[in-house]
């Protein structure tokens, strides 16, 4: 029987406790056996100029995942043509790891715009989607409200953003509680976001 692996995509610029709480909750309170935190080199929907280099963001994810046995950093998208789309990554990763059943993890906010994703119908036909709650305007398209391949997980609502953290660091605010200690140390040592 194949292993169920959740894919939690993000720029992780930087990874913060909100990401870890969601990933760990999915690992512990759903039927997913492992969560891969997939560092995206360039999200087609975000400005690239604000991103740290891929290897720095991956290093922060490695540091953040230490001590969480079911959380695994992944750079699977780094060698794919850019800009990349989730449907392409899923096809690539399923071919590379055929003994895993890959599922998407996304916030309710992303589910609301999922129908606009490239080949969203192919994604949902071939992969389950695990959704965690987010506070966001708008509503989920009717076709996804009760879809058989969508599982809603009652994870804590965490309203922390990497944008807020970057801005706070630039303003010399103490954001220690929002970051894993090893991640904060790396950011401080490397003088990032100042």
UniProtKB/Swiss-Prot annotation:
GO terms for biological process: NAD biosynthetic process. Disulfide bonds: none annotated. GO terms for molecular function: ATP binding; nicotinate-nucleotide adenylyltransferase activity. The keyword Oxidoreductase does not apply. It is an enzyme of class 2 (transferase). The keyword Nucleotidyltransferase applies. This is Probable nicotinate-nucleotide adenylyltransferase.
């Amino acid at each position: 029987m194949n292993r169920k692996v959740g894919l939690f995509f993000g720029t992780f610029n930087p990874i913060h406790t909100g990401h870890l709480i969601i990933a760990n909750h999915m690992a512990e309170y759903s039927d997913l056996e492992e969560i891969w935190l997939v560092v995206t080199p360039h999200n087609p929907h975000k400005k690239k100029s604000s991103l740290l280099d891929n290897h720095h963001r991956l290093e922060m994810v490695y540091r953040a995942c230490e001590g969480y046995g079911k959380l695994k950093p992944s750079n699977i998208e780094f060698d794919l043509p850019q800009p990349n789309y989730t449907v392409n990554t899923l096809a690539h990763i399923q071919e590379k790891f055929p003994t895993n059943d890959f599922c998407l993890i996304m916030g309710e906010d992303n589910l609301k715009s999922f129908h606009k994703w490239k080949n969203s119908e192919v994604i949902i036909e071939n992969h389950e989607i695990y959704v965690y709650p987010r506070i966001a305007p708008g509503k989920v398209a009717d076709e996804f409200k009760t879809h058989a391949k969508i599982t809603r997980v009652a994870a804590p609502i965490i309203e922390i953003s990497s944008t807020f953290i970057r801005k706070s660091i630039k303003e010399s605010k103490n954001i220690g509680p929002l970051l894993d200690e090893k991640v904060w140390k790396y950011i401080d040592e490397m003088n990032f976001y100042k």
